[in-house]
Structure formats: structure tokens, C-alpha cells
Amino acid sequence: MKLSLLAIAAIAPFVSAHYFFDTLIIDGQESSPNQYVRSNTRAAKYNPTKWVNTRDNMTPDMPDFRCNKGAFTFAGQTGTAEVKAGSKLALKLGVGATMKHPGPALVYMSKAPSTAKTYQGDGDWFKIYEEGVCDKNKDLKSDAWCSWDKDRVEFTIPADLPDGEYLIRPEHIGVHGAHAGEAEFYYSCAQVKVVGGGNGNPGPTVKFPGAYKKDDPSFNFSIYGGYKEYPMPGPEVWSGASGSKSYSKVVNVNAADATSEGTFGHREHARDFNY
């Protein structure tokens, strides 16, 4: 589903507050909106999913939490992009939005039994990327987070991932209201066919819904009152994946270090390091 210029203009005032992923980028080549990313049937495409003060009767406990409300109805008309294992991908937000909520970004994948177009996402999901806090010396209510004000989540398809068709699920979690149980989830699903892969065994795996619980510390976290370590949600990043960017356990990180890839760039299982 393509948005008209009039629709984009109507949405524009709201995109800094709410947003949606609709564009797949493969090795720097940007596709068209929803060419490879399933759309949704939300009253407004950018509506978040929440447990409290819900919109569109959607909560993280529903099957549509896999790819968003009504997304499977778009699966057949959504293309499946061929991507090489080891290639660099990104999922970009629609209509010029940026992630102007504090919180982590994550990327999950799930292998389709046959084709991505016919897969509802009811199988096993594994995490290939996550990013949390990049600089503990900045404001936890804003730019301390790696994803702050970015328009995309960038990651690498694991080189050892077996060939086949997959769903890729990018997710950004706004935690500005998490202290009151109102974490906001922004997510969608891209359809891809992985080629040139290996014999890896992705895991640990989870199911959606089920991977997240309303009382998880990740979704009842307060960004107020100074820095505190954020407990990343979901399973560990698959060890065969290229890495993560999250420095919430780094004791002394200055701004220069936090932005230097040579010192603190993408790191595998960054949250597991003991400092």
C-alpha cells in the first residue's frame, strides 16, 4: 500500500511521536515503501502497540504482535527480496520519521516453512541484533540511546544463516511511559530469501506472542531520575549473528568513545560483557 502525497502531508505532524517501518535497504540500495515490508490495518499506520491505553484493540499478547495488526493480509502482495548472507541491511521508517522516543531497537528473524508470503510468523524467532544505551553520560530520556533520532535500524544478515525464506522483524520500543506500564512497540515484518548462507543453528528462540510479558522489567523501566542499567528484552542475540550495540554495562564511556567504532562500535553480545 503506497501513501499519496496528501496522506504523507497529513501524517507528517505526528511522525516524530509515532512511526512505522516500511522500507527495506539492502547493501545501501533502498527499495520502495512496502515493496518488501508488509503494511498493516491500523487506524493509523504509526499507532503503537501497548498493554495499557491500547490503540486499535492491539496488545503484545495477540498473534498480530508478530508483524502488526492485519499485516498477514498484505503478505501475498508484498515482494520477497533476495539477500546474500553476510549482506548489510536496514529497515527504515516511513514518511521521514525518526525514532524520537527513548528505548532499544532490536531485530528478529523467523524461517518460513515454505515461502515468506504464506508464513504467518507462528514459528520460532531468534534475535540477530539489538542496541540499547550508547552513552551513559548523556540523557537517558533522549540521546543516551543508540537509536535516538535515527530513521532506521541497521544490521547484518548472519553469514552462517541457512538458506531459505524468512521474516525479518525490526522493532523499536519506546520506554518513555514504561514506568507506568505503557511501553510502546513499533514493529513490522520484511520478507526475504537468504542465499549463500551456511549451516548455523540460530537460537535461542522465542514465540510471538509470548516472548514478552507485561511485568517484564524491560517494560516497567523508568528513564527518570538519572542513569540506570536497562534490562534488554527477549532472548540473547544469536552467537552466529554479527553483533549488537549496547553499552548499558559500560562503567565509564565518554562521548568520543561512544561514537568511535574503533573503540565501542558494533559488539557481539555487548550486554553480556562484565566490566
Swiss-Prot record:
Coarse class of the protein's main subcellular location: secreted
Keywords on record: Carbohydrate metabolism, Cellulose degradation, Copper, Disulfide bond, Glycoprotein, Metal-binding, Monooxygenase, Oxidoreductase, Polysaccharide degradation, Secreted, Signal
Applied biotechnology: Lignocellulose is the most abundant polymeric composite on Earth and is a recalcitrant but promising renewable substrate for industrial biotechnology applications. Together with cellobiose dehydrogenases (CDHs) an enzymatic system capable of oxidative cellulose cleavage is formed, which increases the efficiency of cellulases and put LPMOs at focus of biofuel research.
InterPro entries to which the protein is assigned, alphabetical: AA9 (IPR049892), AA9_LPMO (IPR005103)
Reactions catalysed, as given in the entry: [(1->4)-beta-D-glucosyl]n+m + reduced acceptor + O2 = 4-dehydro-beta-D-glucosyl-[(1->4)-beta-D-glucosyl]n-1 + [(1->4)-beta-D-glucosyl]m + acceptor + H2O
Entry's cofactor comment: Binds 1 copper ion per subunit.
Enzymatic class: oxidoreductase
Coiled-coil ranges from the UniProt annotation: none
Glycosylation sites recorded in the entry for this protein: 220
Subcellular location field: Secreted
Annotated disulfide bonds: 67-189
PANTHER family for the chain: ENDO-BETA-1,4-GLUCANASE D (PTHR33353:SF2), PUTATIVE (AFU_ORTHOLOGUE AFUA_1G12560)-RELATED (PTHR33353)
Family listed: Belongs to the polysaccharide monooxygenase AA9 family.
Protein name: AA9 family lytic polysaccharide monooxygenase D
